[in-house]
């Protein structure tokens, strides 16, 4: 017999707790506990035990109340009811003190692994977390309905980023309109930033814009290097004129001007990398930034763009130095390299950039790859034209959109937020009854729908003044002061995401098969995905809000979902017996499958995640096998829209070992250990792993660490036939 607590956890029934609670009510009234009182308390406790079934806490308390009211001690019943009411008030009151002190004193491991790119020991991060704790408390007590809070706590759904929800102007992620801001000027902290006249200045201003923009949102941001390309030409022209004035001939002027321009690009990219990785935004972290490298975005400045891309890749291969002065893998920016006809074929003009990208991926985990070819098949606009554009941050994709003039527009658009459904919970709640599954599925989706509507309405009250750099000065719009952002939330300009997690566990429980079986498992998985999309289409049509299906990364939520499933359903082999659940539609990390089969299979599901998705393969050390990386890249171009290769990039600061730092089980806790010297001090090692699309460098919670440990290596260090 178990008692189900308010947060969904289960505890073995303890009769003594009932006896003690009733006894306290008797003592409160009688000032003592008589033998008759003891007898009555024991009688109630025995009765509840005799029911021999799982009960919710509220059900247990209701029984106690009923039994006392049915007795001749209604005064004790009233005392118990009053006590229960007061306890409820305490639960509803501000309960942040304990959480904040745990953070400040470092007594709760949760904060050290809540985000793989945040160090909870640093005061700027602590300040952000304290603000987040307060926001979450306000959100839970005042802004969300009780049933949504309960569903979130029980792991039935996940209401993302409640720690930023109290403010009504914070959205999720965006494609920053850097071109507009650099060409037409912008304002930062009431200072006018005019159009720069050289690449180095433009690159520096870009980092200031990035920091300001990401301080006014909570998700990832993306810029394109295309916005910087015109300033390379400006710099070149300045250098050319300088040498021309010295009386040099045309060829000499061109030669020296190009040398100086390349040196400026090198300096500008280095400054950009230092700034992005050293500056801290108001979220207490480096900006979660992605940088798009897409030659197809410009014809006029394609040569200049190629020079910038080349330098970004070269410097990323080199890395940034740690405190020991050793070059290591940096987390940001994430690099998004678009594969196209101009760079994918060995005889194409820019194939050398793809070779450089492959070397970079083998050593530093980035760039990730977007196939222009496949994306244009997936993203069709209202004119019937295929479109290619980057994701916002790590994986969130906008839907195709045409402006008033019928032209495609992507930069300057954003995502309003995410609510995720736990698909394994739907499956387990149905007890393998397919009719019941679809009934619960629809109910849970409506719960998500209501939560998403609340997100939308929270933003709908915002005016442009609340984040001028976003709404007035070009990052997302150029609205007037005091103007509502309401129009930007409708008719496809921005998206709002219905996330999903654990498709594999859901399918495995309901069918007994993985969705890789090319049979009943895959058919059911595709049906689930199609119904998610059907719901989004239904909501979108009714409300003119761009709902979109999103493959949620669940970086730390994977652990929460796994624990909640065990609390609600116990340990079920192959479903709830791990400390994580599988991301989105992914093949489970432990399943043995070759890289090409995995990518081909997942491409089918990626098309059904239009609001965001990314696939990956896990690789061994490929620094000496770049040819294998090239073959995978070519496969990505022909078969899947967006994918990445996970390699390892570690360094032990104690002994200098730069191979893979291993995960070990130390007394039931997973930890990291240098296989060379045994060092386990996190502060004396650098570990870089992909956790949710981004590279994590600050270690991970137990669930995510377990997932990393179980990853099957799809591509070993051997030649691909």
Predicted regions and their residues:
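Metallocofactor- and cofactor-centric catalytic cores in central/energy metabolism, strongly enriched
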Residues: 265-269, 273, 508-509, 704-710
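Charged, amphipathic alpha-helical regulatory modules used
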Residues: 1-106, 709-714
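Contiguous, well-ordered alpha-helical segments that form the cores/surfaces of helical PPI scaffolds
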Residues: 293, 496-509, 530, 690
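Alpha-helical scaffold elements adjacent to nucleotide-binding pockets in ATP/GTP-utilizing enzyme cores
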Residues: 17, 21, 63, 307-312, ...
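Conserved catalytic cores of very large enzyme subunits
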Residues: 89-90, 96-492, 513-514, 518-676, ...
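Short, mixed-charge aromatic SLiMs
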Residues: 45-50, 68, 524-538, 710-721
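Long insertion/accessory domains within large nucleic-acid-processing enzymes
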Residues: 676-721
